[in-house]
């Protein structure tokens, strides 16, 4: 019988939940890199407009953490996008003044 409870883990990247979320004015974004690769972490509004690039750099395997801090955003939901060579991860964050 096949085990239907198996969890498939990302091969190359893992994006942890941002915290705090909702945030004002700063949230922490942590992620794991399992192979050497160039990564971009960007923040988008719900219209799909890229409002910030948090990092666009070559990463070695390991655990990383960056902060997104913004006081001039309107209240609302934003999307964090972690894009590597072979995987893309997204996550919603909420900014509340």
Protein language model regions, located:
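A detector of long soluble domains/segments in diverse envelope-associated and cytosolic proteins
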Residues: 1-2, 94
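Glycine-centered coil/turn sites that cap beta-strands in beta-rich domains
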Residues: 2-19, 23-45, 53, 65-70, ...
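Extracellular Ig-like/FN3 beta-sandwich strand-entry sites
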Residues: 36, 61-63, 73-77
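Solvent-exposed serine/threonine-rich low-complexity stretches and specific carbohydrate-binding patches
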Residues: 51-59
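C-terminal tail/sorting-segment detector
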Residues: 53, 67, 71-97
């Amino acid at each position: 019988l096949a085990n239907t409870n198996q969890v498939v883990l990302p091969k190359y990247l893992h994006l942890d939940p941002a915290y705090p979320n909702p945030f004002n004015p700063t949230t922490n974004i942590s992620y794991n890199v399992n192979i050497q690769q160039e990564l971009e972490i960007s923040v988008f509004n719900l219209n799909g407009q890229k409002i910030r690039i948090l990092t666009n750099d070559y990463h070695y395997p390991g655990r990383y953490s960056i902060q997104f801090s913004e006081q001039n955003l309107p209240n609302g939901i934003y999307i964090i996008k972690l894009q590597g060579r072979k995987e893309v991860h997204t996550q919603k964050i909420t900014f509340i003044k």
